[in-house]
Design a protein with these regions (language model features):
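P-loop NTP-binding core
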Residues: 1-212
């Protein structure tokens, strides 16, 4: 993805060169690398419109995919701004920790500012969900109530539980689907259903997988 920003690609053929297939049919990625750490500096030094580099690039391949997910590090920088400009919906994972709530507030403030400053009505904050959750602990229950009080109806009911299999597959560079039964997979599937962003056919297919 660093090449996308560095060379400010605008053509579909240029973007397609960055796309890699995965072991999962129908799932492609544009991976990052250590070089991506220089992207913020390179964008800052450029005098062009740095806010829409990602949006302009993804527009060329938008019709090739049902969904495009943008995964951002928790930072308020030009990369996050690019993702906000390029998005229709924004979903934020949070942990039941005080600094996570502070970071979420900063993210929401950025979204509101960008929407108002640039008149971007299409962007919607869909909600936040709790990740790495130990659902039987008092810390989780207290933290969930704290987020509920601050987010009202913007906190999804489905938490994603802690799952040691995530670390295991990360070490072997495998998909989580290769690990067999996984709490995280089940939770993310239920979370997708709660978000109501799937097509009717996709929703029925996912429900069928959960019932197996």
């Amino acid at each position: 993805v660093c090449e996308l920003f560095k060379y400010r690609f605008k053509e579909k053929a240029e973007i397609q060169q960055l796309i890699h297939t995965t072991q999962i049919p129908g799932v492609d990625i544009i991976p990052s690398s250590k070089r991506h750490t220089r992207t913020v500096l390179e964008l800052t030094l450029n005098t062009g419109n740095n806010n829409i580099v990602l949006k302009r690039a993804l527009k060329t391949i938008k019709e090739d995919y049902d969904y495009i997910f943008l995964d951002n590090a928790p930072a308020s920088n030009i990369l996050t701004v690019n993702s906000i400009f390029a998005s229709d919906y924004i979903i934020t994972p949070v942990k039941v920790e005080q600094y996570s709530l502070k970071g979420l507030r900063e993210t929401l403030s950025s979204i509101v500012y960008i929407k108002e400053e640039h008149d971007l009505e299409q962007i919607e904050f869909l909600g936040a969900f709790i990740t790495q959750a130990s659902i039987n602990t008092n810390a989780f229950k207290d933290g969930r109530e704290l987020f509920k009080d601050n987010l009202q109806n913007k906190l999804f009911k489905t938490p994603v539980r802690q799952d040691t299999k995530i670390n295991e597959v990360n070490q072997t560079l495998r998909s989580l689907f290769a690990s067999g039964t996984s709490n995280a997979i089940i939770d993310y599937a239920n979370l997708l259903l709660e978000m109501k962003i799937l097509t009717p056919a996709g929703e029925e297919k996912l429900k069928g997988c959960l019932s197996e």
